[in-house]
Amino acid sequence: MTNIRKSHPLIKIINESFIDLPAPSNISAWWNFGSLLGVCLILQILTGLFLAMHYTSDTATAFSSVTHICRDVNYGWIIRYMHANGASMFFICLFMHIGRGMYYGSYTFSETWNIGILLLFAVMATAFMGYVLPWGQMSFWGATVITNLLSAIPYIGTNLVEWIWGGFSVDKATLTRFFAFHFILPFIIAALAAIHLLFLHETGSNNPSGLMSNSDKIPFHPYYTIKDILGLMFLILTLMLLVLFSPDLLGDPDNYTPANPLNTPPHIKPEWYFLFAYAILRSIPNKLGGVMALVLSILILAIVPLLHTSKQRSMMFRPLSQCLFWLLVADLLTLTWIGGQPVEHPFITIGQLASILYFSTILVLMPISGTIENRLLKW
C-alpha cells in the first residue's frame, strides 16, 4: 500500500512542498529566511486577529481602544507588542531574503522574483496602513503626508487623494477603509506566497555556488526542517527579547499622543523599515520627482535580472561584485539613518549623495563589474 502522504490529494501537496522536496545539499543559513517569513506572516495574522476583536476603527475611539487592549484585555499588551514588533522582524527577514536573492543571483527565476516584488509592495502597503490604525500623532500625520504624495500625479492627483481619503482630509472614512484593507491584505499576501512557492518549486532552489544542483539533492525533511527550526528559535528569541524588554524601542514616542489635526509633530517620519525610501523621497526637491524616485527605489528590483551581465550566476566567486553589494548594503543603512534625521545641513547633502549612489550602484556599477569579471576570466 502506498504511503498516505504520497497518495492523499491534499497531503501529497504538503509532502511535495515540505517533506520529500529535493533541495540542494549546500544551501546556507541565508536560505532560512523564506520559512521565517512564513512564520512571521502566520504570527501577524493570528495576533492581528485577536487585536481586531477589541479594536474599533473610529476616530473617536481608536486610540482609547488600543489603550484598552494594553490595559484591560487579558495579555492584550503582549499581543499588541508582538504584532507591532513582529512587523519589524518581518521586514528584517524580508530585507535579508531580498539581499540573499541579489547576492546569489536567485533573481534569474523571473516568475518567483516578480511575485516576490509584488509581495514586497503588498507587505509595505499593509504595514503602512497598520501604522495608521492606533490613531496617534505619527499615525495621523504619517497617513496625511504619505497619501498626499499622490497629489503629485498630474491631472488626476488631487481627485485621487480625496478619493483615497473619502473626504477632504484624513478622517473617519480613511481610518475605516485602512482597517478594512489592513485586515484583508495579509490573506492576499498568503495567497501570493503560495504562488511564490509554486513557481520556486517548478525550478527548484538556487544554491550559494549558483551552479546546477540536480545531481546532488537531499530531501527537505529532516535536514532542512531541523535547520529551519533553529532559525525559528533565533527569530522567536529576538522577537521576545524586543517585546518583553524594550517594546517601544522601534516605535515613535509621538504615537502615544492622540491624533490632533491642529498640531503638527516636529519631525514626521515613518517606521524604521521605510526610512531608506523616505530619505530617497526627501532628497529630490521636486514633489513629483521625489514620488517617482520613491517608487523606483523598490521597482528597480524588477530590472535587476535584465542588468545581470556576468556569466556566473552567484557572487560567490566575484570579489568585485561582492564589494559593490556590500557598498549597497552600507548605502541603504546610511539612507535609513538619514531618513530619521531632520531636513537640514549636512543631512540633506548626505541623503542626496546616498540616493545617487543607490541608483548608480544597481544601474551602472554592478553591470560594469560583471563585464569586468568576465574579461578578467577571459570569457
UniProtKB/Swiss-Prot annotation:
Pfam families reported in the protein's UniProt record: Cytochrom_B_C, Cytochrome_B
Membrane-traversing stretches: 33-53, 77-98, 113-133, 178-198, 226-246, 288-308, 320-340, 347-367
Gene3D superfamilies (alphabetical): Cytochrome Bc1 Complex, Chain C (1.20.810.10)
CC cofactor: heme b
Protein origin, superkingdom: Eukaryota
Chain residues that bind a ubiquinone: H201
Residues that coordinate or bind heme b b562: H83, H182
Main subcellular location of this protein, as a coarse class: mitochondrion
Gene Ontology CC annotations of this record: mitochondrial inner membrane; respiratory chain complex III
GO MF annotations in UniProt: metal ion binding; ubiquinol-cytochrome-c reductase activity
Annotated residues for binding of heme b b566: H97, H196
CDD domains assigned: cytochrome_b_C, Cytochrome_b_N
Cofactor annotation remark: Binds 2 heme b groups non-covalently.
Membrane topology: Multi-pass membrane protein
Quaternary structure annotation from Swiss-Prot or TrEMBL: The cytochrome bc1 complex contains 11 subunits: 3 respiratory subunits (MT-CYB, CYC1 and UQCRFS1), 2 core proteins (UQCRC1 and UQCRC2) and 6 low-molecular weight proteins (UQCRH/QCR6, UQCRB/QCR7, UQCRQ/QCR8, UQCR10/QCR9, UQCR11/QCR10 and a cleavage product of UQCRFS1). This cytochrome bc1 complex then forms a dimer.
UniProt similarity note: Belongs to the cytochrome b family.
Function noted in UniProt: Component of the ubiquinol-cytochrome c reductase complex (complex III or cytochrome b-c1 complex) that is part of the mitochondrial respiratory chain. The b-c1 complex mediates electron transfer from ubiquinol to cytochrome c. Contributes to the generation of a proton gradient across the mitochondrial membrane that is then used for ATP synthesis.
Other known facts: Heme 1 (or BL or b562) is low-potential and absorbs at about 562 nm, and heme 2 (or BH or b566) is high-potential and absorbs at about 566 nm.
The protein, known as: Cytochrome b
Species, as recorded: Galidictis fasciata
Lineage: Eukaryota, Metazoa, Chordata, Craniata, Vertebrata
